[in-house]
C-alpha cells in the first residue's frame, strides 16, 4: 500500500520572519499532485484575524478546514471577550485541536505569525499538534532547506520592513530554483500593529548578465 503522507507533506515552501515592528510571511503559489502541477495560483496564506496570518503546507482540504475552524473560534472569542485573540493563544488553540485528532491526523504543516500586545511573533505547528515559538526565522515545506540557507546567512535582528520583505522573497526564490514542488509567483503578507497587507511578487528572476560561451 502506498503511503502518500510524506508526499503530501512536502510540496511547498513557506517562510516567516520577524522584523522591527512586525512579521513577514511568504509562500510560493504552486500546488502539486505527485509529479503534476495542479495549480499555479494556489493560496497558501490565510488571514485569521486582523493581526494574525497562517501559512499552509500539506493537504489543501485539511488546511482549508483548519483555517475555517480557526477563523470561527477567533471571531467567537472576540465577541465573548471584547478583544482579539493573541497569537500565542491562537497557536495553542490550533495545537490542541490537531493533537486531539492525532490518530486521524490532518496532513499539514503550518506557520502562524502576527502582532499582539507582546509584539510580533511566529509559531510553527506540526500535524501532531506540536507548537514552537520561533525566535526570528522559520521555513517549512519541501523547499525549506534551501530557504533556510538564505535566511540563516542574511537575517539580522531589528531589520526594517522593506529589508525583511526582500529577504523573505529571496529565500522563497532560492527554494524555487532547486525544489520542483515550489514555483510560480510569491505571495507576501506583512502584519504590524496597524495593518495586514498582502501582495504578489514575481517568482521570476531578474535578467542576469550574458555568460560567455565555450
Curated annotation (Swiss-Prot):
Primary site of residence: cytoplasm
Alphabetical keyword list: Autocatalytic cleavage, Cytoplasm, Hydrolase, Protease, Proteasome, Threonine protease, Zymogen
Activity regulation statement: The formation of the proteasomal ATPase PAN-20S proteasome complex, via the docking of the C-termini of PAN into the intersubunit pockets in the alpha-rings, triggers opening of the gate for substrate entry. Interconversion between the open-gate and close-gate conformations leads to a dynamic regulation of the 20S proteasome proteolysis activity.
One GO location term (cellular component): cytoplasm
Enzyme class: hydrolase
EC number of this enzyme: 3.4.25.1
GO biological process terms held by the UniProt record: proteasomal protein catabolic process
Propeptide section residues: 1-11
Active site: 12
Pfam families the record matches: Proteasome
Domain of life: Archaea
Compartments in which it is found: Cytoplasm
GO molecular function: threonine-type endopeptidase activity
SUPFAM superfamilies: N-terminal nucleophile aminohydrolases (Ntn hydrolases)
Reaction catalysis annotation: Cleavage of peptide bonds with very broad specificity
NCBIfam families: arc_protsome_B
Protein purpose: Component of the proteasome core, a large protease complex with broad specificity involved in protein degradation.
PANTHER family referenced in this protein's UniProt entry, alphabetically: ATP-DEPENDENT PROTEASE SUBUNIT HSLV (PTHR32194:SF0), METALLOPROTEASE TLDD (PTHR32194)
Family label: Belongs to the peptidase T1B family.
Subunit structure: The 20S proteasome core is composed of 14 alpha and 14 beta subunits that assemble into four stacked heptameric rings, resulting in a barrel-shaped structure. The two inner rings, each composed of seven catalytic beta subunits, are sandwiched by two outer rings, each composed of seven alpha subunits. The catalytic chamber with the active sites is on the inside of the barrel. Has a gated structure, the ends of the cylinder being occluded by the N-termini of the alpha-subunits. Is capped at one or both ends by the proteasome regulatory ATPase, PAN.
Protein name: Proteasome subunit beta
Amino acid at each position: 500500500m502506498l503511503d502518500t503522507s510524506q508526499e503530501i507533506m512536502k510540496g511547498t515552501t513557506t517562510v516567516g520572519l520577524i522584523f522591527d515592528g512586525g512579521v513577514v510571511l511568504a509562500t510560493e503559489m504552486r500546488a502539486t499532485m505527485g509529479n503534476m502541477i495542479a495549480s499555479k495560483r494556489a493560496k497558501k496564506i490565510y488571514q485569521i484575524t486582523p493581526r494574525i496570518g497562517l501559512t499552509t503546507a500539506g493537504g489543501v482540504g485539511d488546511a482549508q478546514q483548519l483555517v475555517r475552524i480557526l477563523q470561527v473560534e477567533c471571531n467567537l472569542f472576540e465577541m465573548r471577550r471584547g478583544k482579539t485573540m493573541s497569537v500565542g493563544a491562537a497557536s495553542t488553540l490550533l495545537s490542541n485541536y490537531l493533537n486531539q485528532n492525532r490518530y486521524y491526523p490532518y496532513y499539514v504543516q503550518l506557520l502562524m505569525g502576527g502582532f499582539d500586545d507582546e509584539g510580533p511573533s511566529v509559531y510553527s505547528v506540526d500535524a501532531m499538534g506540536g507548537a514552537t515559538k520561533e525566535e526570528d526565522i522559520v521555513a517549512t515545506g519541501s523547499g525549506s532547506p534551501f530557504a533556510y540557507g538564505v535566511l540563516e546567512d542574511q537575517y539580522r535582528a531589528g531589520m526594517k520592513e522593506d529589508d525583511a520583505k526582500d529577504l523573505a522573497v529571496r529565500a522563497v526564490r532560492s527554494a524555487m530554483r532547486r525544489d520542483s514542488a515550489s514555483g510560480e509567483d510569491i505571495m507576501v503578507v506583512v502584519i504590524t500593529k496597524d495593518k495586514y497587507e498582502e501582495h504578489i511578487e514575481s517568482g521570476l528572476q531578474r535578467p542576469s548578465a550574458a555568460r560567455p560561451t565555450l
